[in-house]
């Protein structure tokens, strides 16, 4: 009889041992889920894997966000905490909307190289709400057409899978690299079509931007 009581106590849902056991099972299950998500990408291209974010992405992403070359046209370089917050927001966007900015891997060696993907801007201006295509890659991977390759796949996903009718993008007019990518996506730029980014102080050198868009039927329309 004592043996029976002892066995029951080890399985008692109120016992500390049971709680520890369930936490261990949950943690193991969570790791399996995370591993599955990371190993099963959202999109693949000839050279890229676009997937959900993992913990191992945080350090290289922070290095990238502290690189003055990468952040040339942004308001500031980011601290590790600010960079991690971007990862958290990207994952929150996936949970809320079912899509978001994807972590980008180079297929050749599975190296994390930045992000590419769709998101809903958090600020309000005359062309929002909208869905934006954006990208940010480590400087070592510039000039190889990777941003264009990944962005094309993301735009196609937005139109064909999500059923979007229009996708927008915006950049600082001086950012020639991003403008070239936008042009390759079928977007157009006009110097007259600029706006002040509402999340930056008036007159900030990175505050002036131009938004452009491409419609699902391939007709380019300006959104400025």
Language model features with spans:
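Extreme N-terminal basic, low-complexity initiation segments
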Residues: 1-13
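Cationic, low-complexity basic patches in intrinsically disordered or flexible, solvent-exposed regions
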Residues: 8, 20-23, 224
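Acyl-donor (CoA/ACP) binding surface of acyl/acetyltransferases
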Residues: 15, 26-73, 101, 105-224
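Conserved GNAT-fold acetyl-CoA-binding loop/helix
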Residues: 69-90, 100-102
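Short loop/turn motifs at secondary-structure junctions and domain boundaries
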Residues: 93-97
